[in-house]
Amino acid sequence: MTVTDIASRTYNHSWRLDPIIRSLLDTDFYKLLMLQMIREDYSNQQVTFSVINRSRHVRLAEIIDEGELRAQLDHARTIRFTKKELIWLAGNTFYGKTHMFSADFIRWLAEFRLPEYELRKVEGQYELHFHGPWTHTTMWEIPALAILNELRSRAAIKGRGRFELDVLYARAKAKLWTKVERLRKLENLRLSDFGTRRRHGFLWQRWCVEAVKEGLGPSFIGTSNVLLAMDNDLEAIGTNAHELPMVAAGLAKDDEELRWAPYRILDQWRQTYGGNLLIALPDAFGTKAFLRDAPEWVADWTGFRPDSAPPIQAGEEIIAWWEKKGRNPRDKLLVFSDAMDVGSIEETYHHFTGRVRLSFGWGTNLTNDFVGCAPDGSFNLDPISLVCKVSSVDGHPAVKLSDNPEKATGLPSEIERYLRVFGDVGRVRKPVLV
């Protein structure tokens, strides 16, 4: 394993274009899983993804040079899956299953390229949209966010001295290792890297993954980043995302179809995949609404990934639902991944251990925690909340309600309609930091 001196590489940066995205596998595993199903069942749907900066106080268009951003986006569009990558996808075992991806899908990937983008500046922010077939626009989400976050990081460290950069990265490494030492104390912990989309940079994410792999040993069960999984002989981790119910809801012709849209697309998911991939994401239109109306077969799924409610509150609610359905929570799995850090991982672990199977996805606070590390005390490396969500489906506006109204996306009039259909019970507003 070659260890890169990140500080030296940053300081010596002099080339015209240092590509942020170098592989189409530099994405989250669930994008490929969803893509295979999308291609089978939704190949004709036109879906727009839009970047949203929830941290409005950070004016990205005044920090990131537009020419540099366009150059990175343009470069990403030139990348194709390599023969080596396709052979690995076709032949590897994922979640205990061989041939997770069909031969026909692998052949289709060989010709895949990212579609065009639409970019403009508006009031200090970038408006970045990806229009086209869902089979193609979906693959922009992760690279677009990674590009924006890394360009912001590069702008923040530009002009810093060689030794200042040494100190910056030394402090960040020590900070991470302190977290690893705390996590080592949690017996039978199961933790994965979920930090691609909001990482400080690719090299930093790679360092973090390799460090946690060494530091936690078998407690580190894998990474959502497909490229890092391939390069580091790790499990690729991930199931499905909010875009599935958001698109299904956007296609609904009336309120009754809207109410059942999340379950209809999950039923398609279980027909495509099974076993350990049966993890439901319940909060797209509110967890309480999801559990209230869920068909009986949802209780037979492997587990849930609570994503926007406070973790202990969400976990207790799901456990109570399982018990009401006559299922034993000890046989089920909860995957906690919303802004988790060492403190919330410890608290959630101690609260639920022995009552339910647990797994944790560690994202931004693993791969982009430079808070307090800058020698000059600046805050411009602190992480921001940047997302890329479905904004329209076949010309109809898309909506995400979330358990936290601060995370809701969509037109106000459409949000009101969705609240009328799904209800507003159990949604609690809290600040969104990452």
Swiss-Prot record:
One of its GO terms (cellular component) is cytosol. GO terms for molecular function: nicotinate phosphoribosyltransferase activity. The modification Phosphohistidine is found at H242. Keywords: Ligase, Phosphoprotein, Pyridine nucleotide biosynthesis. Pfam families: NAPRTase, NAPRTase_N. It comes from the Bacteria. Transiently phosphorylated on a His residue during the reaction cycle. Phosphorylation strongly increases the affinity for substrates and increases the rate of nicotinate D-ribonucleotide production. Dephosphorylation regenerates the low-affinity form of the enzyme, leading to product release. GO terms for biological process: NAD biosynthetic process via the salvage pathway. Its EC number is 6.3.4.21. The keyword Phosphoprotein applies. Pathway: Cofactor biosynthesis; NAD(+) biosynthesis; nicotinate D-ribonucleotide from nicotinate: step 1/1. It catalyses: nicotinate + 5-phospho-alpha-D-ribose 1-diphosphate + ATP + H2O = nicotinate beta-D-ribonucleotide + ADP + phosphate + diphosphate. The keyword Phosphoprotein applies. HAMAP family: NAPRTase (MF_00570). Catalyzes the synthesis of beta-nicotinate D-ribonucleotide from nicotinate and 5-phospho-D-ribose 1-phosphate at the expense of ATP. Belongs to the NAPRTase family. This is Nicotinate phosphoribosyltransferase. It comes from Bradyrhizobium diazoefficiens (strain JCM 10833 / BCRC 13528 / IAM 13628 / NBRC 14792 / USDA 110).
